[in-house]
């Protein structure tokens, strides 16, 4: 089992975001702005969905990694730490999914 966490990935994204856009894909996305990063996130989400529909386990793992990475880039640009998202997930799991949905 891997000990690598989303917080670890978030730290890598933060470091790479400070690099030259000529040398780092992360920096290039951050420099291009939220529209470009969000578009890329959407593309990766579609690719993950396609892999899931095809029951392509290996590709679903690969595309899920891309999806998580691009989500963290979008969160970085929006200045939202992954911890904030995890807190929201924790809040939601304190009640049943149906109760949470009804409370919206």
Curated annotation (Swiss-Prot):
Gene Ontology biological process terms from the UniProt entry: L-histidine biosynthetic process
InterPro entries registered for this protein in UniProt: HisE, PRib-ATP_PPHydrolase-like
Catalytic activity as recorded in UniProt: 1-(5-phospho-beta-D-ribosyl)-ATP + H2O = 1-(5-phospho-beta-D-ribosyl)-5'-AMP + diphosphate + H(+)
The entry's keywords: Amino-acid biosynthesis, ATP-binding, Cytoplasm, Histidine biosynthesis, Hydrolase, Nucleotide-binding
A Pfam entry, by short name: PRA-PH
Membrane-crossing segments per the record: none
MF (Gene Ontology): ATP binding; phosphoribosyl-ATP diphosphatase activity
Cross-referenced SUPFAM superfamilies: all-alpha NTP pyrophosphatases
Main location: cytoplasm
Protein name: Phosphoribosyl-ATP pyrophosphatase
Native species: Allorhizobium ampelinum (strain ATCC BAA-846 / DSM 112012 / S4)
């Amino acid at each position: 089992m891997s000990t690598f966490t989303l917080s670890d990935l978030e730290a890598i994204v933060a470091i790479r975001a400070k690099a030259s856009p000529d040398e780092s894909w992360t920096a290039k996305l951050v420099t291009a702005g939220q529209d470009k990063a969000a578009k890329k996130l959407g593309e990766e989400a579609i690719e993950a969905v396609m892999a899931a529909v095809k029951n392509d386990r290996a590709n679903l793992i690969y595309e899920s990694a891309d999806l998580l990475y691009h989500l963290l880039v979008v969160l970085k640009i929006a200045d939202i730490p992954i911890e904030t998202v995890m807190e929201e997930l924790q809040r939601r799991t304190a009640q049943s999914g149906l109760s949470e949905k009804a409370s919206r």
